């Protein structure tokens, strides 16, 4: 009986970094993740680790020329995911891309010539993948785009956050020590920050305050990267909720679905309806990655960036905009007490055909508000989002109205709940 959807969007994929993308191993280590302060802010000392290339401008390496000569080698983890696929579409054949991912079903192969099987939860698999990069003659890496991570709304916590997101990052960093690496980009999330109040704007120095295992694992991974990076420049991208013209945002999809099906649950909310979260369109997200790679030589050695739209729609504004597009009229959203919402959510889960997305633990997050100050990304990258969720909603909704079954299937919704037209 609650719709706390807009309270904790990510990069999905980053935003859909679920374990089927990663080929998880049962041999994963299960050490406890520790959440500490932001190492970027406290000047954590560097240890001997990855080696930055010393030949950034001489063009000596003929086998893997630098990007300045027209090609450069990129390693993209999670390359068959939504963000990875969109990035590969964007860069085309400009670079030599090494896609680290699971080969075969259930996902189509990444759109790159070199697809290398890599299970981040396995030491052997990660090192074998890097050995294959070496065998292909690529010792000098222009940029590592580390997009793969574990992510799921199924539960508040999971050992896979530690095994994949944290220890998988550690395996990758250790394996890269034999390479010359010009840049390491880590896809993090806005949820590492404590929420703000409407009218305030979160910047990169805003206090940390992750509330569940997904953002907690990102904080731990960020700090691990800063400890183990050696002299390799790193970019920590803290990303808003990623969506595209077909939606592909789990919480946003669920919100649209409830209003489309005219469910009563779509009219109630356990949080402050004047609060909302930051989104970013996939094309703008990818552009930020491209610009970070292109500007890697001018960026500080440790760069934290918030990537999201400047405008944050409140939950109520989003409800009204969706209902106008779907039904030609605005819905009124009613706020209910959190204890009642948790009880209703639990009772609903016992019913046949219950909404599998809503969980009682989400209700405590429903008041969270995220609004970005993106001036650092503007200054360092020259990045400016060209899309807004407000202007993109008509395209998203029209896609649903023109082909409900296809839209449901593409967004992994149960088609049996589609209302009769």
Language-model features: where?
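Amphipathic terminal alpha-helices
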Residues: 62-67, 372-380, 384-421
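NAD(P)-dependent short-chain dehydrogenase/reductase
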Residues: 228-277, 282-284, 291, 322
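Conserved C-terminal active-site "lid" loop/helix of NAD(P)H-dependent oxidoreductases
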Residues: 282, 344-384
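Mid/C-terminal beta-alpha module of Rossmann-like enzyme folds, strongest
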Residues: 291-357, 374, 390, 394-395, ...
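NAD(P)H-binding glycine-rich loop region in Rossmannoid oxidoreductase-like domains
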Residues: 120-164
